[in-house]
């Protein structure tokens, strides 16, 4: 534009040094303008989006530090802290994954993990100028959020499934009242749980409890003893006035493993043992064992033996050392492979099918021999399972537990039992109510009571069991 005639042009009067000074001022002004741009504008689209996906809120820290700090806390710090806690407490992972509050927290954290990254990516996109940088940031952001959302959605679904299993398998809260009390204070300081292995298959009369093991825990020391009850024990007594006592005043005339199916098939008797959602057949059996042996039974755990096979497979197997060769049984319903004629001697790693055959075999000895093997197998499983194994295999375990396990324990009580059993050193004594100690065909229940009292005293006082 031309200067008015009354204003002279002094440009021609400027010296070379003046031109240099003006150029320096222009460069400084350009640098100042660039430094005042948002930090996210100085990064490329891919770098800003990557920062938002890894550490949500970090790209927008200089624009809105409060929002950035909140996103970073909810989307990065808390998830990382949760993973660290799970790793540090991996030996207690059973109690964590069976805690409904923990599962709910996991679901909330998974949702926040995705939402915080979505918000951070939107902030990055809004900070870009119109055109190709914004389009590139949008494309990268959407792809990244979807990619991270997939494992988060899977985690929420698994946690929700596990919550369903907890509600199906366990009672909502543990009861302070024992399942079957005997009115004797000799068992004070102990918690006793009845483990039942239900053998349901072709030719069976409902569900027969061929495996019955009392796990008695000295609560102060954590020491544990296991007592196997023979399936062929006769004359089981019941508390006076109960439906089973009225039906069988001289004792149950059949094998002990027939009590469960008898109650199951007689609704008029089963109805008298109803207690919430618990199995009335298990309550009736527990009351008979409690009264006959003068021991308070606090809870029960019932496992279908087919589920026992599946549980061992889901845990990756179990290893036992056999002192001698053991003949294996014929084909068992549900077995996944054909049994070899023998296993052992020496170290044997068993899958679920082999372990079930080991626990069920009577070919090499008798019912009494297999009772001892069942206790050995339970001890081995409990002591060999690592917390990391439970965590990595839990999705399979939960589905198996849904249809194979029923119990009067709450999820918290069950996880505490598993944690105690996993400490193999805490299982101090193991005994079967078998000859020559006990005659199952004509049992003297006073002798059984004395034996159990001595067993509890031995683990309470940490002394040798006199009947061993």
Report each predicted region and the residues it spans:
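Cytoplasmic membrane-interface segments at the C-terminal ends of transmembrane helices
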Residues: 59-66, 117-137
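Membrane-embedded alpha-helical segments of integral membrane proteins
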Residues: 75-128
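Hydrophobic, aromatic-rich membrane-embedded alpha-helical segments
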Residues: 39-69, 73-76
């Amino acid at each position: 534009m031309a200067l008015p005639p009354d204003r002279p042009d002094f440009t021609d009067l400027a010296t070379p040094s003046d031109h240099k000074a003006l150029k320096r001022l222009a460069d400084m002004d350009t640098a100042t303008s660039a430094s005042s741009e948002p930090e996210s504008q100085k990064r490329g689209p891919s770098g800003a989006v990557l920062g938002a996906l890894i550490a949500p809120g970090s790209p927008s820290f200089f624009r809105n530090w409060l929002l950035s700090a909140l996103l970073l806390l909810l989307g990065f710090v808390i998830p990382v802290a949760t993973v660290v806690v799970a790793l540090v407490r991996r030996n207690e992972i059973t109690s964590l994954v069976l805690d409904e509050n923990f599962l709910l927290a996991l679901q909330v954290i998974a949702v926040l993990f995705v939402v915080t990254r979505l918000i951070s990516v939107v902030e990055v996109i809004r900070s870009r100028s119109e055109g190709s940088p914004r389009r590139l940031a949008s494309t990268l952001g959407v792809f990244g959020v979807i990619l991270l959302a997939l494992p988060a959605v899977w985690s929420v679904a698994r946690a929700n499934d596990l919550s369903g299993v907890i509600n199906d398998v366990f009672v909502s809260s543990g009861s302070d009242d024992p399942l079957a009390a005997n009115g004797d204070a000799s068992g004070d300081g102990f918690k006793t749980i009845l483990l039942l292995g239900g053998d349901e298959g072709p030719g069976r009369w409902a569900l027969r409890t061929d495996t019955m093991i009392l796990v008695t825990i000295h609560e102060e020391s954590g020491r544990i003893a296991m007592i196997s009850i023979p399936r062929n024990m006769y004359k089981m007594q019941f508390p006076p006035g109960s439906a089973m006592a009225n039906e069988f005043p001289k004792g149950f005339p059949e094998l002990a493993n027939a009590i469960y199916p008898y109650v199951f098939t007689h609704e008029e008797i089963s109805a008298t043992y109803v207690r919430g959602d618990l199995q009335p057949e298990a309550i009736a059996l527990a009351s008979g064992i409690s009264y006959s042996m003068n021991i308070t039974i606090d809870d029960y755990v019932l496992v279908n033996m087919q589920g026992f096979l599946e549980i061992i497979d889901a845990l990756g197997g179990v290893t036992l050392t056999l002192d001698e060769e053991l003949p294996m049984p014929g084909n068992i319903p549900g077995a996944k492979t054909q049994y070899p004629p023998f296993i052992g001697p020496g170290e044997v790693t068993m899958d679920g099918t082999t372990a079930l055959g080991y626990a069920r075999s009577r070919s090499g000895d008798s019912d009494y021999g297999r009772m001892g093997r069942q206790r050995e197998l339970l001890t081995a499983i409990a002591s060999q399972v690592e917390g990391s194994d439970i965590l990595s295999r839990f999705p399979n375990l939960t589905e198996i537990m849904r249809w194979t396990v029923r119990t009067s324990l709450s999820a918290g009580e069950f996880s505490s039992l598993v944690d105690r059993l996993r400490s193999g050193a805490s299982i101090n004594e193991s005994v079967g109510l078998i000859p020559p100690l006990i005659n199952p065909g004509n049992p003297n229940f006073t002798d059984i009571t004395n034996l159990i009292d001595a067993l509890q005293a031995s683990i309470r006082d940490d002394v040798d069991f006199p009947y061993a």
